[in-house]
């Protein structure tokens, strides 16, 4: 936003149903008032991603830029590497009962179910590292041609985009959310959900 590549309006999805997310109409491009050092500011700190403590200005989740995932924050041109997209629900875990992986949603009333598709499941747009966008209708895919896999203890396993799989050996799995706190370790990061 600060460099003028995108307007702040793009940060609000037209399909977003969370009333706490709104366009930042007062984004300051020069010497923002909320900056610690206004002359050296590289962005407007009043642009807020956290919609859990008042109004936020960002609808979209992005891959956590940390650990093994950090290398994926570049032009890898991989068609299965999700990098940004509509927010998803918080995932409690992934179940392999019956021989098929299924994501277990923590809150069955997640606001993210209201944004697209049927009201009892998640659907949304996901942008990938090769610059294409797909409309995705599942939280966990099963086709290696279109869905990313990570190296788990049991071998290659399909990745759930909104879950940080604990058995990921290299910490390269795709984990997407809006993050309000970062740190040197994955445990120091705070993801928010609705």
Q: What is each PLM-predicted segment?
A:
Residues 1-194:
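Short, well-structured segments within or immediately adjacent to enzyme catalytic domains
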């Amino acid at each position: 936003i600060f460099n003028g590549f995108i307007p702040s309006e793009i940060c609000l999805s037209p399909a977003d149903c969370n009333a706490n997310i709104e366009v930042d109409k007062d984004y300051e491009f020069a010497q923002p008032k909320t900056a610690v050092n206004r002359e050296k500011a590289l962005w407007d700190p009043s642009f807020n991603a956290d919609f859990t403590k008042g109004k936020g200005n960002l609808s979209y989740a992005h891959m956590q830029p940390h650990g093994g995932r950090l290398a994926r924050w570049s032009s890898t041109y991989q068609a299965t590497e999700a990098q940004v997209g509509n927010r998803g629900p918080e995932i409690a875990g992934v179940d392999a009962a019956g021989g098929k992986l299924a994501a277990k949603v923590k809150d069955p009333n997640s606001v993210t179910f209201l944004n697209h598709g049927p009201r009892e499941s998640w659907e949304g747009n996901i942008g990938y590292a090769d610059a294409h966008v797909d409309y995705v209708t599942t939280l966990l895919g099963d086709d290696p041609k279109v869905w990313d896999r990570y190296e788990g203890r049991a071998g290659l396993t399909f990745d759930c985009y909104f879950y940080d799989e604990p058995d990921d050996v290299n910490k390269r799995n795709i984990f997407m959310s809006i993050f309000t706190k970062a740190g040197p370790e994955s445990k120091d990061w705070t993801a928010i959900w609705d």
